[in-house]
Amino acid sequence: ILVVTVYLLPGNRSWGVLVLILGCITMVLGAVMAVFSTNLKYILACTSLSQIGFILVGVAMLTLLGEHNALAAHGTVLYMLNHSLVKLTLFLFAGVVYYNTHQLDLNRIRGFGRGKPLLHGLFLCGACSLAGIPGFLGYVSKTLVHEAVVELAVETGSTAITVVEWLFLLSGGLTVAYLTKIYVAVFWQTAPADAHAASRRWGTPLSVAALMLAAIPLPMLGLLPHGLSEKIAAATLSFTGGHDFSHAVHYLAWENLKGVVISLSIGMLVYFLLIRPLLTERRDGEIRYRSLWPAWLSLEESVYKPLFRWLIRVLMTLCRVACDLLDLLVLV
């Protein structure tokens, strides 16, 4: 999509609007699905869906802002970098959990992270960066993309773009909510009564090193936005068709911090007003998570599997037609 936007349809506003609409739908839908899920791997998969939506919003801003796309160009590239490192961290974390417990349901992996400070810290690196907490790469990238949306809203005076901004902040809040759900379940709740005893040694030296290599750059890049992160993004401007900054970005200015404060507030409201009272239940003295997401709303069952079956039928028909044509050619 980035290549199509930059090289095949440069400056095409209709394409930019289409990408923006797809981005908004994707980032909100993925976040909502993650809030309702109780399976760790499925939550992380929905997280990827949502974060791709954020990236698509940044790609759309590249086109819609035209020559004033410096914020979008830097933010989109850094968002892709952040997404790669965060997902590497969190999926490795999920692998560690599954390797030790052979479970992925939050009700079965509760308390696994208790007494594991290194795993605790590495998870927080990934989660805080994904949530856009200041001091992490995710804050830098999310701030740049958010400010690009704000710039377009001011430039055009469009109510629709203001709605996009609030969808951006809402999705960020939902991100905070489902990450808090995972964090509390794995690191603070007590383990199920029938869970097997977990060893404090949760990974091999190689797996621990892999997790550290993925997680540690997140705060490093977040604490050095001008000296490191922006230089990485600037090296890609010739590819993204972006422009360099005309002035320094003040990441800790209130105007930039305000966005993350709003998202954090939304996230805490969703966690304490939706997840805790409605998506958990107390049974036998234990807090258990439950999923209220309707089965018929499953993307896998209602979209992907039917589409896959349809594609197979189409390909089978094409192959049959090709075979018949070859038979005719042989007969002729």
Language model region names:
Residues I1-W202:
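Hydrophobic transmembrane alpha-helices and their helix-loop junctions in integral membrane proteins
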Residues G30, A127-A131, F168, G172, ...:
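Hydrophobic core segments of alpha-helical transmembrane domains in multi-pass membrane transport
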Residues G23, G126, S207-L221, G242:
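Hydrophobic membrane-spanning alpha-helices of multi-pass integral membrane proteins
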Residues G173-W188, I262-R283:
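Transmembrane alpha-helical segments in integral membrane proteins
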